[in-house]
């Protein structure tokens, strides 16, 4: 009687899980491509882990919290590691809708990949498109980064304006002193005329030096 029950269950499972069956998915793994010399052999233990990960994913779907490992069926396993699987509903003895299984796999694809040290390219659910991992939120909000950059630009601009003002003031203060130095040099300039040192022109007084007056000009009274 037990043997009859076993064969009956096996026949039902074989009918539910077969290539191209309704709600069945094909999986292909490229373990050696991903891991090279560290590749592991695909055996019944790895199959058990796969069933556990699928059951784990299904338990996160509403109203599927009772899914067990035994509800996940594998068939047509090949040495190049490809197989088909379905998830059954034991209460009604049929497979769960493909939409529910697909949604569960997509939500937990990264967890399944990590369990086998693979990625979306080396662990493929052929009828389930791979999804990108959700973007990680930065530890610092974007608006704070933008505000910091703008604040730094403003500080640098203010510093440049202050330094420019100081430089211009120093330049203005330096110009009068240079003019005074030029006048002093002109006052102290001495020329030699016929062997007699004399000032050619009194710059500040505005009168002609006596050394340049002719003999008649000296004798003629003003």
From Swiss-Prot:
The keyword Transmembrane helix applies. Changing residue 75 to A: Increased dimerization leading to hyperoligomerized. Abolishes processing by BACE2. Abolishes localization to the cell membrane. Glycosylated. Glycosylation is required for plasma membrane localization and for its cleavage by BACE2. Proteolytically processed in pancreatic beta cells by BACE2 leading to the generation and extracellular release of soluble CLTRN, and a corresponding cell-associated C-terminal fragment which is later cleaved by gamma-secretase. This shedding process inactivates CLTRN. Three cleavage sites have been identified for BACE2, two clustered sites after Phe-116 and Leu-118 and a more membrane proximal site at Phe-125; the preferred BACE2 cleavage site seems to be between Phe-125 and Leu-126, Phe-116 and Leu-118 act as alternative sites. GO terms for molecular function: protein homodimerization activity; transporter activator activity. Glycans are attached at residues 76, 93. Pfam families: Collectrin (PF16959). Residues 1-14 form the signal peptide. The modification Phosphothreonine is found at residues 214, 220. Plays an important role in amino acid transport by acting as binding partner of amino acid transporters SLC6A18 and SLC6A19, regulating their trafficking on the cell surface and their amino acid transporter activity. May also play a role in trafficking of amino acid transporters SLC3A1 and SLC7A9 to the renal cortical cell membrane. Regulator of SNARE complex function. Stimulator of beta cell replication. This is Collectrin. The gene is CLTRN.
